Amino acid sequence: MQDILEAIMAAEESNDPDRELAGLAGLPVPESYRGVVVRAEEARMFDGMATRDKDPRKALHVQEVPTPELAPGEALVAVMASAINYNTVWTSIFEPVSTFKFLQRYGRLSELTRRHDLPYHVVGSDAAGVVLRTGPGVTRWAPGDEVVAHCLSVELEDAAGHDDTMLDPQQRIWGFETNFGGLAELCVVKANQLMPKPRHLSWEEAASPGLVNSTAYRQLVSHHGANMKQGDVVLIWGASGGLGGYATQMALNGGAIPVCVVSSPEKAELCRRMGADLVIDRAAEGFRFWKDEETQDPGEWKRLGERIRELTGGEDPDIVFEHPGRETFGASVYVARRGGTIVTCASTSGFQHQYDNRYLWMHLKRIVGSHFANYHEAWQANRLVALGKVHPTVSRTYPLEQTGQAAYEVHRNAHQGKVGVRCLAPTDGLGVRDGELRARHEDAINRFRGH
């Protein structure tokens, strides 16, 4: 592994980094590598505990694992950096189910997928790094290519997947429903997960947008999601977070009017630094949408709606960008305008949603489910990053050995934006190839740092 790292680091000082990196093709592939894993033998370790009390630090381990053989259409990537997504938190606390059920199901699909069904799960759904090897049939990518990976793994043998790959019955989230994920020194991806690394970003910055940026793009911009247009009022929950931070940027870029909901003055300030003018600090304003565990408070829905109208000059949201789930969903359905759209992915506060259906059917609103993104949507979202139109939201980074702590902070909402993880990269700030473009956007790139 040291030879691989030295070859990649040589590109840092080279006038021709592409030439340096092409030399990776001549290096042997290590027989094993370090990865962040959960273990099947520990899948019941948190039984009987409340979700909040489950500690990712106890379940995530860094261990040496064998390097898998490449199947046709796959690539082996030396991972310089990755990031924490909420699906890594779910994996680490074995909720809503153990991910070993996903690996077992995938392993039954074919002889090639059987290698995913192991007593350990290498996790992680983001990666930035350098291609080391490609399997048979891969023509677009070659050893030495600097890449980022999106997390849709799809077989594409079903006709439905050729309309929209997210509709393929064999689509899975890499590093969550498949093995050999990105929180590791090496990862295995399908070639159609790869995209060019934005040249003005460091490794940890380039790794961070992947899952959440693509998810926000489909959910908000794509015709498969809310199909946002100029002038739309968009209510964004968690607007300074890993997902909401990208939704806020896309709303601003697209001429929409974001109403950013956050939970602290610091998070409100981050939204303003992104350019948002309309911000609700729901903690400071005392919004409590549930009276107790069983009873919602429609009076609080109404108060939120009044606050939104106060900020917008009397307008209700055309779009509600939902992802907290149980805690906020009743309010989301209520505050959307007549004919408006509640577009939802994830459910970080709970999967069982309750809302008053009268405000949906009688006001002709619609709920749209959105899940990650297809390759085209992910590519377009990455293009916005590469052009400097959308910026990473990395607030802090950890070395691979401290991935458990990074996941713990995301679980406890003790973070802003995205939390990065350095895998092979020894320090932050490496991998920048376009200094001129970076200089134009330095402030925006770093606005989440240190928060």
Indicate residue ranges for each PLM-predicted region.
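C-terminal hydrophobic helical "lid"/dimerization subdomain
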Residues: 2-31, 330-334, 375-451
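A short N-terminal beta-strand-loop micro-motif at the entrance of redox/enzyme domains
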Residues: 11-26, 43-81, 120-122, 137-138
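Glycine-rich beta-strand-centered segment in the early N-terminal region that forms part
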Residues: 66-83, 96-158, 198
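NAD(P)H dinucleotide-binding glycine-rich loop of Rossmann-like/cofactor-binding domains
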Residues: 110-119, 125, 153-238
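Hydrophobic/small residue at the entry helix of a nucleotide-binding pocket
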Residues: 215, 242-243, 327
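Helix-to-beta-strand junctions that scaffold the AdoMet/dcAdoMet cofactor pocket
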Residues: 229, 336-337
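Adenosine-nucleotide cofactor-binding segment
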Residues: 236, 252-327
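Rossmann-fold NAD(P)-binding glycine/threonine-rich loop
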Residues: 347-363
